Amino acid sequence: MIYLIRHAHAVPAAEDPLRPLSLAGVHECAMLVRFFADNRLLLPGQIWHSPLSRSRETADRLTAGLNPDAARVEIPGLLGDDDPKLLLERINALPPRSEIALVGHNPHLTRLATLLVRGRSKPAFVDFKKGSVLALEKTESRHKRSDLPRWTVRWFLPAQLLKPRQATAPAQEA
Protein backbone atom coordinates (compact mmCIF):
# COMPACT_ATOMS: atom_id res chain seq x y z
CA MET A 1 0.00 0.00 0.00
CA ILE A 2 1.22 3.47 -0.76
CA TYR A 3 -0.12 6.68 0.72
CA LEU A 4 0.19 9.85 -1.32
CA ILE A 5 0.17 12.87 0.99
CA ARG A 6 0.27 16.48 -0.06
CA HIS A 7 2.33 18.54 2.38
CA ALA A 8 0.55 20.74 4.92
CA HIS A 9 0.18 24.52 4.52
CA ALA A 10 3.40 26.54 4.35
CA VAL A 11 4.23 30.19 4.91
CA PRO A 12 4.17 32.39 1.80
CA ALA A 13 7.42 32.75 -0.15
CA ALA A 14 7.41 36.51 0.53
CA GLU A 15 7.56 35.76 4.27
CA ASP A 16 10.21 33.03 4.03
CA PRO A 17 11.68 31.80 0.73
CA LEU A 18 12.28 28.34 2.25
CA ARG A 19 8.51 28.04 2.90
CA PRO A 20 8.47 26.01 6.11
CA LEU A 21 5.13 24.91 7.58
CA SER A 22 2.89 27.69 8.77
CA LEU A 23 1.07 27.54 12.10
CA ALA A 24 -1.97 26.29 10.16
CA GLY A 25 0.24 23.58 8.60
CA VAL A 26 1.48 22.48 12.03
CA HIS A 27 -2.17 22.17 13.15
CA GLU A 28 -3.04 20.22 9.97
CA CYS A 29 -0.25 17.75 10.71
CA ALA A 30 -1.47 17.35 14.29
CA MET A 31 -5.01 16.63 13.05
CA LEU A 32 -3.70 14.09 10.52
CA VAL A 33 -1.61 12.32 13.15
CA ARG A 34 -4.50 12.27 15.63
CA PHE A 35 -6.94 10.91 13.04
CA PHE A 36 -4.60 8.22 11.72
CA ALA A 37 -3.37 7.19 15.17
CA ASP A 38 -6.97 6.87 16.43
CA ASN A 39 -8.12 4.89 13.37
CA ARG A 40 -4.95 2.91 12.62
CA LEU A 41 -5.33 3.60 8.90
CA LEU A 42 -1.77 4.72 8.27
CA LEU A 43 1.30 3.06 9.77
CA PRO A 44 4.06 3.46 7.18
CA GLY A 45 7.36 1.63 7.44
CA GLN A 46 8.95 4.34 5.30
CA ILE A 47 8.07 7.95 4.60
CA TRP A 48 9.51 9.40 1.41
CA HIS A 49 9.56 13.17 0.98
CA SER A 50 10.84 15.85 -1.35
CA PRO A 51 13.82 18.06 -0.42
CA LEU A 52 11.58 21.08 0.25
CA SER A 53 11.05 22.23 3.84
CA ARG A 54 7.27 21.89 3.91
CA SER A 55 7.41 18.31 2.66
CA ARG A 56 10.23 17.33 5.04
CA GLU A 57 8.50 18.95 8.03
CA THR A 58 5.21 17.22 7.21
CA ALA A 59 7.09 13.90 6.97
CA ASP A 60 8.88 14.59 10.28
CA ARG A 61 5.61 15.19 12.10
CA LEU A 62 3.94 12.13 10.58
CA THR A 63 6.93 9.96 11.47
CA ALA A 64 7.04 11.22 15.06
CA GLY A 65 3.30 10.80 15.57
CA LEU A 66 2.57 7.57 13.69
CA ASN A 67 5.70 5.43 13.65
CA PRO A 68 8.92 6.81 15.16
CA ASP A 69 10.74 3.72 13.82
CA ALA A 70 9.78 4.49 10.21
CA ALA A 71 12.63 5.37 7.87
CA ARG A 72 12.24 8.93 6.64
CA VAL A 73 13.91 9.22 3.23
CA GLU A 74 14.42 12.25 0.98
CA ILE A 75 14.06 11.07 -2.61
CA PRO A 76 14.23 12.75 -6.00
CA GLY A 77 11.13 12.83 -8.17
CA LEU A 78 8.61 14.29 -5.70
CA LEU A 79 8.74 17.98 -6.62
CA GLY A 80 5.65 19.66 -8.03
CA ASP A 81 6.84 19.79 -11.63
CA ASP A 82 8.64 16.42 -11.69
CA ASP A 83 7.56 13.80 -14.20
CA PRO A 84 5.57 11.16 -12.28
CA LYS A 85 7.18 8.44 -14.40
CA LEU A 86 10.45 9.08 -12.51
CA LEU A 87 9.02 7.24 -9.49
CA LEU A 88 7.17 4.43 -11.27
CA GLU A 89 9.97 1.88 -11.28
CA ARG A 90 10.72 2.49 -7.61
CA ILE A 91 7.05 2.30 -6.58
CA ASN A 92 6.24 -0.74 -8.71
CA ALA A 93 9.30 -2.58 -7.34
CA LEU A 94 8.08 -2.31 -3.74
CA PRO A 95 7.66 -5.68 -2.04
CA PRO A 96 4.09 -6.84 -1.41
CA ARG A 97 2.62 -5.56 1.86
CA SER A 98 4.92 -2.52 1.87
CA GLU A 99 3.49 0.48 3.69
CA ILE A 100 5.10 3.57 2.17
CA ALA A 101 3.96 7.19 2.51
CA LEU A 102 5.05 9.75 -0.09
CA VAL A 103 4.86 13.39 1.00
CA GLY A 104 5.01 15.68 -1.99
CA HIS A 105 3.55 18.52 -4.01
CA ASN A 106 1.01 19.28 -6.69
CA PRO A 107 0.58 18.94 -9.60
CA HIS A 108 2.98 15.98 -9.29
CA LEU A 109 0.91 13.97 -6.78
CA THR A 110 -2.25 14.35 -8.85
CA ARG A 111 -0.42 13.18 -11.98
CA LEU A 112 1.25 10.29 -10.13
CA ALA A 113 -2.04 9.08 -8.66
CA THR A 114 -3.75 9.30 -12.05
CA LEU A 115 -0.88 7.44 -13.73
CA LEU A 116 -0.99 4.61 -11.17
CA VAL A 117 -4.79 4.25 -11.22
CA ARG A 118 -5.54 4.99 -14.90
CA GLY A 119 -2.27 4.16 -16.64
CA ARG A 120 -1.87 7.73 -17.92
CA SER A 121 -1.26 11.01 -16.11
CA LYS A 122 -4.18 12.99 -17.58
CA PRO A 123 -7.01 13.79 -17.07
CA ALA A 124 -6.73 13.98 -13.29
CA PHE A 125 -9.21 12.07 -11.17
CA VAL A 126 -8.33 13.49 -7.74
CA ASP A 127 -7.85 16.99 -6.34
CA PHE A 128 -5.05 17.07 -3.77
CA LYS A 129 -5.60 19.96 -1.38
CA LYS A 130 -2.83 20.55 1.15
CA GLY A 131 -2.92 17.86 3.85
CA SER A 132 -5.00 15.39 1.79
CA VAL A 133 -4.14 11.67 1.76
CA LEU A 134 -4.84 9.02 -0.90
CA ALA A 135 -4.29 5.31 -0.17
CA LEU A 136 -3.51 3.10 -3.18
CA GLU A 137 -3.08 -0.67 -3.37
CA LYS A 138 -1.33 -2.52 -6.18
CA THR A 139 -3.43 -5.10 -8.01
CA GLU A 140 -2.41 -8.13 -10.04
CA SER A 141 -3.65 -6.62 -13.30
CA ARG A 142 -2.04 -4.21 -15.74
CA HIS A 143 -3.35 -1.28 -17.76
CA LYS A 144 -4.16 -2.35 -21.32
CA ARG A 145 -2.66 0.62 -23.18
CA SER A 146 0.41 1.38 -21.07
CA ASP A 147 1.03 -2.12 -19.64
CA LEU A 148 1.81 -0.47 -16.29
CA PRO A 149 0.77 -2.24 -13.09
CA ARG A 150 -2.70 -1.15 -12.01
CA TRP A 151 -3.28 0.42 -8.61
CA THR A 152 -6.68 0.82 -6.98
CA VAL A 153 -7.97 3.47 -4.60
CA ARG A 154 -8.53 2.09 -1.09
CA TRP A 155 -9.60 5.42 0.41
CA PHE A 156 -9.17 9.18 0.08
CA LEU A 157 -9.14 11.67 2.93
CA PRO A 158 -9.59 15.26 1.78
CA ALA A 159 -7.94 17.62 4.26
CA GLN A 160 -11.10 19.65 4.76
CA LEU A 161 -12.81 16.68 6.46
CA LEU A 162 -10.45 17.02 9.42
CA LYS A 163 -10.80 20.76 9.87
CA PRO A 164 -12.94 21.76 12.84
CA ARG A 165 -16.17 23.42 11.86
CA GLN A 166 -16.72 27.01 12.88
CA ALA A 167 -19.68 27.45 15.19
CA THR A 168 -22.29 29.76 13.76
CA ALA A 169 -24.50 31.97 15.85
CA PRO A 170 -28.19 31.09 15.73
CA ALA A 171 -30.30 33.41 13.61
CA GLN A 172 -31.94 36.14 15.63
CA GLU A 173 -35.62 36.76 15.29
CA ALA A 174 -36.74 40.21 14.20
Predicted regions and their residues:
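Conserved phosphate-binding catalytic cores of ATP/NTP-utilizing and phosphoryl-transfer enzymes
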Residues: 90-95
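Domain-level recognition of soluble alpha/beta enzyme cores
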Residues: 121-154, 162
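Functional cleft and adjacent loop/helix regions within the main domain
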Residues: 73, 79-81, 145-174
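Generic beta-sheet signal
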Residues: 2, 96-104
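Active-site-proximal alpha-helix that buttresses catalytic centers in soluble enzyme cores
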Residues: 1-85, 89, 117, 128-129, ...
